[in-house]
């Protein structure tokens, strides 16, 4: 299983801070649900989340500021 590069992940998320938040939220979703069952046993949820972000499977939208 090839690990995605940090540069590639940063381009997808916009910044390393946004990447950390996005990966953490997705990893929590995987932990709390049964989605992780489709991945190889022993693969950590954060690794799965980063692979999904690199593959473009995760779509996100930042909230808009209210005037």
From Swiss-Prot:
Pfam families to which the protein is assigned, alphabetical: RNA_pol_Rpb6 (PF01192)
Gene3D superfamilies: 3.90.940.10
Keyword terms of this UniProt record: DNA-directed RNA polymerase, Nucleotidyltransferase, Transcription, Transferase
InterPro entries according to UniProt: DNA-dir_RNA_pol_omega, Pol_omega/Rpo6/RPB6, RPB6/omega-like_sf
Magnesium recorded as keyword: no
Entry's Gene Ontology cellular component terms: DNA-directed RNA polymerase complex
UniProt KW 4Fe-4S keyword: no
Domain of life: Bacteria
Enzyme Commission code(s) on record: 2.7.7.6
GO molecular function: DNA binding; DNA-directed RNA polymerase activity
Catalytic activity, reaction form: RNA(n) + a ribonucleoside 5'-triphosphate = RNA(n+1) + diphosphate
PANTHER family: DNA-DIRECTED RNA POLYMERASE SUBUNIT OMEGA (PTHR34476:SF1)
Listed NCBIfam families: rpoZ
Recorded family membership: Belongs to the RNA polymerase subunit omega family.
Primary role: Promotes RNA polymerase assembly. Latches the N- and C-terminal regions of the beta' subunit thereby facilitating its interaction with the beta and alpha subunits.
Self-association and partners: The RNAP catalytic core consists of 2 alpha, 1 beta, 1 beta' and 1 omega subunit. When a sigma factor is associated with the core the holoenzyme is formed, which can initiate transcription.
Annotated HAMAP family: RNApol_bact_RpoZ (MF_00366)
Protein name per the record: DNA-directed RNA polymerase subunit omega
Organism whose genome encodes this protein: Moorella thermoacetica (strain ATCC 39073 / JCM 9320)
The encoding gene: rpoZ
